[in-house]
């Protein structure tokens, strides 16, 4: 008899069929067991869980007594209680490699569109405001040869540094827990303290995950240390930046502008002051949102779950210590 799993996000048909070759697949649209008795029943039998979003905590895990593996179609996993999963011996799988290049593309797009005011000026053209040759009140600022400061030199940070260094001749600064030899050799990157990064970067690019240590890592004090001409780009996690402090800094000219793919509350509330600021480019968490990459993420998550439940995991496990007990 095939193991039973719960799939709580729509995936391409061929990937669904791949899962069905190995498991009895119970498909649902999201995780709301209180309103879906069928989902509650499926969770009781499920050995695997695959999807994205939802809060997977101790209370949720009590609904799934037979769960052995959870596979998230994302690189981030802050919606999972990793400690609770590990205590139960449940492997948590994620997709850290397949979205790297696409997220780096998104960050470059935010840098360019924010610096050159692409979104704002496109809307002004559509509104019929372009009636004569433009003046300097429509000008943006250059990206090339400016200093990029990367907060978090992981896979995405490396991909961003590559684009900045080779594509735009940008000096690369970075702050991370330890020096990154490859970044320094390939891109001439310079490891520095957070204070130095804030003081010298023309573009502060945040790629950090959300943890207790990174929560509000960039707040009023840190923003005040940045250049008044600096632009903040966040495609990591929203709560890494104190959003209220950022709004104030953008309103009073402490920093020049911001390009944001992530927010403290998502979707971004319609009454957010961020939506009223011309010096903000806000996009709806599209970092990995291309057809190709989302397919590859789903395929990776499918493989991850198959590997986890068949005992063949070699990578992409958040809590590999539990595999010893499987």
From Swiss-Prot:
Localization of this protein: Cytoplasm
MF (Gene Ontology): glyoxylate reductase (NADPH) activity; hydroxypyruvate reductase (NADH) activity; hydroxypyruvate reductase (NADPH) activity; hydroxypyruvate reductase [NAD(P)H] activity; NAD binding
Catalytic activity: glycolate + NADP(+) = glyoxylate + NADPH + H(+); (R)-glycerate + NAD(+) = 3-hydroxypyruvate + NADH + H(+); (R)-glycerate + NADP(+) = 3-hydroxypyruvate + NADPH + H(+)
Keywords carried by this UniProt record: Cytoplasm, NAD, NADP, Oxidoreductase
Record-annotated disulphide pairs: none
Record's GO cellular component terms: cytosol; plasma membrane
Any Pfam family matching the protein: 2-Hacid_dh
Active site, per annotation: 237, 266, 285
Enzyme class (EC, first level): oxidoreductase
EC number(s) recorded for this UniProt protein: 1.1.1.79, 1.1.1.81
HAMAP family registered for this protein in UniProt: 2_Hacid_dh_C_GhrB
Functional note: Catalyzes the NADPH-dependent reduction of glyoxylate and hydroxypyruvate into glycolate and glycerate, respectively.
Homology family: Belongs to the D-isomer specific 2-hydroxyacid dehydrogenase family. GhrB subfamily.
Quaternary data: Homodimer.
The name this protein goes by in its record: Glyoxylate/hydroxypyruvate reductase B
Gene for this chain: ghrB
């Amino acid at each position: 008899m095939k193991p039973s799993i719960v799939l709580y996000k729509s995936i391409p048909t061929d990937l669904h069929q791949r899962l069905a070759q190995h498991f009895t697949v119970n498909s649902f649209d999201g995780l709301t067991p209180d309103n879906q008795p069928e989902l509650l029943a499926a969770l009781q039998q499920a050995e695997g869980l695959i999807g994205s979003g939802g809060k997977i905590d101790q209370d949720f895990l009590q609904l799934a007594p037979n769960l052995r593996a959870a596979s998230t179609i994302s690189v981030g996993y802050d919606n999972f209680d990793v400690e609770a999963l590990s205590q139960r011996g449940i492997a948590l799988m994620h997709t850290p490699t397949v979205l790297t290049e696409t997220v780096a593309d998104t960050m470059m797009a935010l840098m360019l569109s924010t610096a050159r005011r692409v979104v704002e000026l496109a809307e002004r053209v559509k509104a019929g405001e372009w009636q004569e040759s433009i003046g300097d009140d429509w000008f943006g600022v250059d990206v090339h040869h400016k200093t990029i400061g990367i907060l978090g030199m992981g896979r995405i940070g490396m991909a961003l540094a590559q684009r900045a260094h080779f594509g735009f001749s940008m000096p690369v600064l970075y702050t991370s827990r330890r020096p990154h030899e490859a970044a320094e050799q390939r891109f001439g990157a310079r490891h520095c303290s957070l204070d130095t990064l804030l003081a010298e970067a023309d573009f502060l690019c945040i790629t950090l995950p959300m943890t207790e240590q990174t929560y509000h890592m960039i707040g009023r004090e840190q923003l005040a240390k940045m250049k008044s001409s600096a632009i903040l780009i966040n495609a990591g996690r929203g709560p890494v930046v104190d959003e209220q402090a950022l709004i104030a800094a953008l309103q009073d000219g402490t920093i020049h502008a911001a390009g944001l793919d992530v927010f403290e509350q998502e979707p971004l509330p319609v009454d957010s002051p961020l939506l009223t600021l011309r010096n903000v480019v806000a996009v709806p968490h599209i970092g990995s949102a291309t057809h190709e990459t989302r397919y590859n993420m789903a395929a990776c998550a499918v493989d991850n779950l198959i590997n986890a439940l068949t005992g063949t995991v070699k990578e992409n496990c958040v809590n590999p210590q539990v595999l010893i007990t499987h």
